[in-house]
Amino acid sequence: MAIMSDLPRDLLAEILSRVPLASLRSVRFTCKKWNDLSKDRSFLKKQIVEAKKKQLKSKEFEVIMMRNFRVYLTSVDLHNDVNPSFTPKGTLTSFSDDANQHQVDNVSSVFHCDGLLLCITKDLNFRLVVWNPYFGQTRWIQPRNSYHIKDIYAIGYDENKNHKILRLKDQYYDYDSHPRARICEFELYSFESNSWKVVLDVSPDWYIHSYHRGLSVKGNTYWYATEKHGYVNFLICFDFTTEKFGPRLPLPFNATESFTYDDVVTLSSVGEEQLALLFQSDATLMMEIWVTSKVDPTEVLWNKLFLAVDHDMIEFDYELKFVADAGSFFIDQKKNVVVVFDKDMNEHTHRGMAYIVGKNGYFKRVDIGEEAYTSCFPLVCSYVPSSVQIRQLT
């Protein structure tokens, strides 16, 4: 009787192609032949294409969630109106620290680009790790000097698909000899060279709040930014090909008229090529969701309003006001709803909540579990798998 490892490569590839992409990591440990095939670039590309086709047909889709300082690849099903589900995928709920061989449960931020996740730890050293959850690959990245709690990060790639990480710090600090001293640092890490370099020609007249998370679309990262000496707000993009920031990009709403710092503005993506923006007014609690029709480092065009929600139309027992440094969201285009993640702070125990909001007053609140840490808000970002490999360092 033939055993699997003796089968011809073409037949073995056909069999393994039927294995769910998320299970490939377990397959690698079966034998060397399976391990080699599962890492073959053409095989992986085929797997990714099939996985995306299945996802389009399925009622479920996948997102990345961060809860209690852990990162989860999560399956979402919103088509059951009675009991929508957010289910962590068992083998991909966390990753191992290569140095210490234990699960990492101290992630403070996570960013997605091209199937890769950039995770920032909250330990004293603020370490960086890049993770491909499907392939179980990680790379821990050492700083050029040191990391800081106020650092802002982004992950992207240039026109040649070379992946890079941007670290920026633009803050004011009080020192005895130099009160309100400004520290402005911009650095780029290259996966190809495994090294950092300083970006020199940057002297911005704008700033980004440390709690405003960047969003990567088509390899470049976008932020909600504010003029340094005024109240003008806009988007700014870092182009990983030119390694420069682009011009100010327009918001879909009037960012100067009665705008306050308690208004909520947060970014998300739709698929791999569209930018989405959530705006909630602190004064009226009106929520608007906009989606781009065109997005690149020098130009952003906005489609018509995707969804506008008047708080008075929602049957809820208290004001639905998202926290300025939380309120992460994603759009389910099939169901035509927006799902916003936040924390219920009105109960004795803090609970992570998913608020499903649609047109004509459609609203549903889903309890996603207790939050053990008051300082950790549930974060979510869209996830699209890819065949990008994290080259292991020797």
UniProtKB/Swiss-Prot annotation:
Disulfide bonds: none annotated. InterPro entries: F-box-assoc_dom_typ1 (IPR006527), F-box-assoc_interact_dom (IPR017451), F-box-like_dom_sf (IPR036047), F-box_dom (IPR001810), Gal_Oxase/kelch_b-propeller (IPR011043), SCF_F-box_component (IPR050796). Transmembrane segments: none annotated. Residues 1-47 form the F-box domain. SUPFAM superfamilies: F-box domain, Galactose oxidase, central domain. CDD domains: F-box_AtFBW1-like. This is F-box protein At2g17830. It comes from Arabidopsis thaliana.
